[in-house]
């Protein structure tokens, strides 16, 4: 949890009028599972006013099934991975997973991110037309330099 996450939460709550719940994913699709110590360190960052949930839903399609009618607040770098075929068995498999966003009424609030010295935003991502309307972007004007992070 860093200042960028807090800023994203605050901007998202202001834009949507909804309360934010942080998700801690113990088993991410492109990272090793979190250790007990990593989970404890993560949870220790929250205070009693923060809302959080822990899952093992490594893909956003799984999160969609767990949390229907939600708005997921993510960075553009994360949205790129949602459409990366390396996380699926085939293009057809990826499209079936993406369709779950429609099935479960999922929306994405996408924040621009600096990745390898280039700022990417929602407009830079090739989003399947069947879910394009489910994505809303916050662009560079909302980006805070102190929380830039190259990944």
Go through the PLM ranges and name each one:
Residues 1-151:
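Nucleotidyltransferase catalytic core that binds NTPs
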